[in-house]
Each structure stands twice: as C-alpha cells, then as structure tokens.
C-alpha cells in the first residue's frame, strides 16, 4: 500500500485535506466517496524535493526538534508495547495533526512494507532524520532493542531542545533591551533633540561644544539614519552569505575561539553537544570510530569539528579516546578526566552523558553571568546617553540665564 494526499469537498462545500493509504489513487477516490467527500485531487505522497539518485525522495525542509522528539516518543511507546513497526508508523501518522508529517511517516511505512529496515527507510529522508538518528536506529534494530533506543533518542532530542530554549530565552531579554535602547536613542536624536535645540539656534547665541556636537549627531541621524539602517541590514545579509564559503567560515570560527569570553562559550556549547551525542551513540551500540565521525557533525564550530575528525582518525589507528581528544586542545580538563575514567571502567557512555550534563550546567551558569553583567551595562549606557542629551539641552538654558542675569 502507498500513501496518497487528497483534496476533497465535504457536503457543506468546504475543502478537506488529508492523507490516506491505498493500493491506488482510484481506491482513494472510492474511500473518499464512501465518506461522503467529493475528491478534487488525489496524488502520491507529496515530497519537497526529488534527487536524481535513483529517484530517491527527500524532504528539503526537516522536522523541528520538537516534532522529531514527539514522533520518536510515540514510536518508542508503540514499539515497546509490542506493536509492529509498520503499525506503529501508521498510528503515529494518524496521531499527527500535520499533513506533512503524516505524509512523511506513511512514506517511511511504505518503504518498511517493501522490506526495508526502519533505518534504511529513514535514509530516504535525510533532512528530516539526521545521520545521528539513523545510525542510532540502525544499531537498535541490529541489537534487537529498537524500543529502548527510540526512547533514548526521544530523551536526547528533548534535552537538546530544552537546552537550546534555555539559551535562547537567556539571550532574548538582552537583545530586546539593546534594540529598545537603540530605538529610543535614535528617536531622541532624530526627532526630539532637533525641535528643542532649534530654539537656541534661532536665538543666535553661541552654543556650548556639547550642544553643537549633539546637533551634529542629530543632523547625521536624521539625514543618514535610514540609509545606515539599510546598510546594516545589507551587511548582515552579506555576512551570512559569506559564511557559506568554507574558507571565510573557518576564519570566522577561528576568530570566535580567540575572543576571550565568546571562545569559552563556543567551546562549552560544542563540547557538551559532542559529548551528549557520543553518549547516546555508544550506548545504542554504534562502534566508537563510527560514533565519533557522526558526533563530529553536530559540532557547529568548524575548527573544533576538524580537530575532532583528526581525533577520530587517531582512535581508528589505535590511540585512546582521551589522548586523542586531549591533543585537540579544545576539551576542558574535567571532561577529559571523566572520559578517561569511563574508558578505564568500561562505562564510557555513562561518563559521557554525565560530563555533558555538567558542561551544559556550566554553560548555563556562564550565560547567566553574561546576562547579569549585560543588564546593568545597558542601564548605565542608557543613563549616560540620556544624561548627555539633557546636559546638551540644559547648558544653553543656563548660559542664557547667566546672560539675562
């Protein structure tokens, strides 16, 4: 059976969309008529992109971490309840409210019914199910423990999503504060200051230096502010485009690592992500060398990723994991000590998971400290700007009062 997307009209004339499984489009139309729906369009499961490699179908837009965690959790629950994987996929598709996810899961189910493994079926959708996910599922199928492995994958995906949300929420307030501050300063300089200071200019009196400087800045903002804003947006777009070039991206990532506080945050983020990914792969039975290659792909910083790839090569040649990672110079000593302990005790996956949690807690503390320092800095900055503007307006008034006196 294959999956078909349909567009139909109900008895009241409203359009209905959905996905049905059937042997042919003709059977789908018959099923729709039995449900008192008038079929308008029926076609095989729609995909976003079709490559030229043997007609392999892929979705150009992947699943969000939240959707992936939810689908994985549902599959884990159903598989552990002794439901066959094809039935679990059908139930998860029926449970989803997203037509796109329904289509994807039913397409995976169709591949499973053709005799492919679950991991092999997921390989048809690489943007939705990353290599880490597929390798872990393959290891679970090979070991005969697919249910527990899916449960671990759901936990891993949810933890990654929660960590990402914590960082985003921690950075949200400073960003809003900075944007609001810049907007207020721009409004004062572009509209308020010119009207107030114009009175003193018309009086013909000699203005203090601070007032003249403020008038100059205000005139520049009024004349060129919009153009400067457009140029800034263009610069951001150009920078993002330049980051697509490998050479520029590596130089930028190297620069970030050299910035004192930023470099530490980047290392903490990437090493924690690497450790948690390596933990779930090794726990699921993926060979260490293969797990290292997969875990390296989740590292965002190219410099650190390249060093980990070199470390994986050393492990392949017989070196210990601890020595290989230590040679990169990118991993904190505590993490290396815990990995060494895991290698000696044979509990590498547990030590990796523990050190990843410790690193994530340390990262959260670092971000909290930065946010705590940033807030008073922005308040002091705003207070200083307002003070300068007030002084620039008051100084001519005081000078005028002295002349009158």
From Swiss-Prot:
Gene Ontology molecular function terms on file: metal ion binding
Record topology, Cytoplasmic segments: 1-168, 240-376
InterPro entries from the UniProt entry: GspF/PilC, T2SS_GspF, T2SS_GspF/T4SS_PilC_CS, T2SS_GspF_dom, T2SS_GspF_sf
UniProt key word Zinc: no
Superkingdom to which the source organism belongs: Bacteria
Transmembrane segments: 169-189, 220-239, 377-397
Keyword GTP-binding: no
Subcellular localization, as worded in the UniProt entry: Cell inner membrane
Periplasmic face of the membrane: 190-219, 398-405
Membrane topology: Multi-pass membrane protein
GO-annotated cellular components: plasma membrane; type II protein secretion system complex
Keywords: Calcium, Cell inner membrane, Cell membrane, Membrane, Metal-binding, Protein transport, Transmembrane, Transmembrane helix, Transport
Binding sites annotated in the UniProt record for Ca(2+): 97, 151, 155
Main location: membrane
Subunit and partners: Type II secretion system is composed of four main components: the outer membrane complex, the inner membrane complex, the cytoplasmic secretion ATPase and the periplasm-spanning pseudopilus. Homodimer. Interacts with XcpR/GspE and XcpY/GspL components.
Function recorded in the entry: Component of the type II secretion system inner membrane complex required for the energy-dependent secretion of extracellular factors such as proteases and toxins from the periplasm.
Family recorded in the similarity comment: Belongs to the GSP F family.
Name the record gives this protein: Type II secretion system protein F
